[in-house]
């Protein structure tokens, strides 16, 4: 069991100490449509350390005191809900033939269909977010609520999730903060996941602990980052060591084990239909030289340097 240092507090813990009603739920909870056993079941909490579930009061904010502010972490199904998105009658659907793939992926029917289903999950998430926004508006809280929309990683493909290429590391980040952030503002400097912690505390007027490496993105103390650092080590049973530094234009990657292939054996990914399809076409000689080299080469370069303006696909 891994214990966090006693002096470090979880974000919901800091909010709770400040008088907030704290929530951990799913889109159904936040939209007010969860029922049955699901109604009282908390959202995803697969943290990698021991923690006290009491830092969260409920899956959603219905039971808070009159006028009590609330902090809610809402877990959407995201890109994992391909089947749900593909069969949903609430959203438009992408045709696999219309999919535009990164140049390093083959236009294999399985890959195209998977990517189309992945794009459908965007529409499903948009629909789910709309349900949550509708509830906030109905309750008169929308203009009084700061909302962050963020994902945990990129698409779970051969150069996406678990890797340091932009396909896995670059994620959407939207902020709704009435009277605090001007709508339509676009910022292009590097931002880290952890910055969400400091920014949340800043908007709530809660002191940001000095031990935090996170930076608030707004306010007089905001300092823009010049670069973002990322890493890959052990993923499931697969050992690796990759370090990367990205500025607004350049990406430098260093591979600690260049003698290992990009697609090392990994039980989590190896049975995915897309991986099977890519390997099948590789064995049959149907991949382009670029695809074969980037996906199925037995070795990697020790160092990689990309000009993202001229080579956005790395």
Regions found by a protein language model. Give the residues of each.
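Formylglycine-dependent sulfatase
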Residues: 1-304, 312-313
